Amino acid sequence: MELKDKANPAAAEHRRWMRELQLADKREKDWRELGKKIVKTYKGEGRKKNSFNILAANTETLRPAIYSSLPKPDVRRRFRDNDPLGKAVAEVMERCLSVAIDHYDFDECCRYDCLDALLPGRGVSRVRYVPSLAEVGTPEGHEEDAEEPSHEAQEGEVEEVEYEQVVCEHVDWEDFRRGYGRVWAEVQWEGFRHRLKKADVRKRFGDEVAEDIKYDEEKDDQNSSKSQWDDTNSELFKTAEFWEIWDKEGGRVFFLNEHHKALIFPVDNPTGEPPLKLERFFPNAEPLRLVEDSSSLIPTPVFELYKDQAEELERISTRINKIIDALKVRGVYDSTLKEL
């Protein structure tokens, strides 16, 4: 897609990527609507009286068959040569992986991925680099050779990485978008949706972006009335929608918001350089799908494979229960028995 507006290339590029998101929504619109219906059925929302929720029963049966416990890292040398150093390195890597998945709730991430794959049909997780920074001054032992330290160094405002880790993070199936592709290798971009408060936007993207964004109230609690909150409190909880775009073709990562007519880059990464140097660029593997298709990446929910049988079972179960409710209790006895 070419940029036509040469007078304002930033706005033109923003329009291009907003159009990419719209096309991604359109491609999977029918599947998203179907996924919402399946999730509601699983939760029992709108369930008819005397019906039988076979979807919930089947899902709870299949979940432990797909994933039941934390995986155990197994690192081995590719070639079993007489290489003590290689064996030691493999053992160290295996222990590091074991410790890494114990430091956060990796089990929850896997469980949610499997649940999304069983219901709407797509489970997504991503990796995130999480460094812990510490403020330091001029390094010790270099006072004589080093030049006069800057004001920030004298004040102890120079930051160094004190500890770092990589964690897996579950992505809700409705918060993920992708570029066109029949197979995963053809996908050139991915998008992850975030909702950020104004203070978070200011810290991450600066004052200009924070003031240019429109913020809306989240609708998590449908039963809460607006009168419970005054205007001051309401402003504190308003959020704005952002899309984190990983552009594989352009080799960059940036953010999009409908109201800010330009690509948005974090203040600590104004060039959009990818924070992770991954071989396949994206921060996630191919999404988990239980029904594979070599001609399309649009998921097929497992429930669609036995939907007709499930509906038939529900009709039969409903009729049986209605018949039972309509029965009147009667008794019979042998008239030849005078005692009765």
Please name every model-derived segment.
Residues M1-L340:
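Extended alpha-helical, oligomerization-prone segments that build pores/tubes and scaffolds
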